[in-house]
């Protein structure tokens, strides 16, 4: 009889709408901490490499926790301006130990570089951690004199050419990996021919995170497709799953029902574009009227699968502005509905500009949610030279659930 009651309770929890869930996490003491992790050139103690190379701005964050518990935070280090083209390196920071969970600025190692060879554009970090702790890091790259729309002016006065479908002029997809907890990285391998459709010019992987499925495969979201890793951990072979209607920047999670959930940036301001499926196929993408979005990247995280199962989503919850960052929880088996959540501005970061834009999340070893979020100083009238930094936030479920509007 007791087991039957438990089964009935589990079914009720699964099918109740998000607003009806009495989450036991709400009774815990709310916790939140935050500080700038990637400090732009206009800030006190700006982040530089050990070589002395500094960066005007940092953008496009990604964060993962390895199987040892160490946290790796990635970003684009933009050398001369905040813009999407020109000399951009892929940089990162690690927590000093596997147990400190990045709780304070002193818990992080200094800035390092994954790759920055040449004056080209390295970006869109999209890591995924395998069962054997191999960290696969997918990257996008294009040549120094190319940009997405062309006719942009580099610091030396060179006018960029528009990215095209030639081998020299197209966006390339690279993969690097680490087998020592992110301490060192292999030379990036160009997988464009294998994993990017023929004839494409522009391309983007992630940015954000890949995932490991309960069935063992790895899945990395990319423009118009998923990249699938099959085979033994640390020795994966990669293939492509095309997705009709998918966006240029996608996020992915395996929901509690075992299905895959793509939540993509819309091509225009409005609402997030969502589709559900499996490795065998996806349904159609459709706007989610409950998730407004200003045509920006977002991030999604499966926090846990046991009852009450929780899926976390973070974006700018506005159809017009990137400054409305809000974190939400869904209790639905398919992440159909998210609660109101909590605005990140409830815990503002002093002296770090105007928070909002791209983000990435991971679950820390002490059961917190760790989130990297962009911040823009908007201290230049044209926006071209406005400095960009990246904030690190740690908060628990109770902090979300005890928000003033939840």
From Swiss-Prot:
Superkingdom of the source species: Eukaryota
Activity sensitivity to pH: Optimum pH is 3.5.
GO cellular component: cytoplasm; intracellular membrane-bounded organelle; membrane
Glycosylated position list: 235, 396
Regulation: induction: Expression is increased during conidial swelling and germination in presence of human serum.
InterPro entries named among the record's database cross-references: Sialidase, Sialidase_fam, Sialidase_sf
Transmembrane segments: none
GO MF, one annotated term: exo-alpha-sialidase activity
Reaction catalysis annotation: Hydrolysis of alpha-(2->3)-, alpha-(2->6)-, alpha-(2->8)- glycosidic linkages of terminal sialic acid residues in oligosaccharides, glycoproteins, glycolipids, colominic acid and synthetic substrates
Keyword check for Amino-acid biosynthesis: no
Entry EC number(s): 3.2.1.18
CDD domains: Sialidase
Signal peptide region: 1-20
PANTHER family (UniProt xref): EXO-ALPHA-SIALIDASE, SIALIDASE
Protein name, per record: Exo-alpha-sialidase
Organism: Aspergillus fumigatus (strain ATCC MYA-4609 / CBS 101355 / FGSC A1100 / Af293)
Lineage: Eukaryota, Fungi, Dikarya, Ascomycota, Pezizomycotina
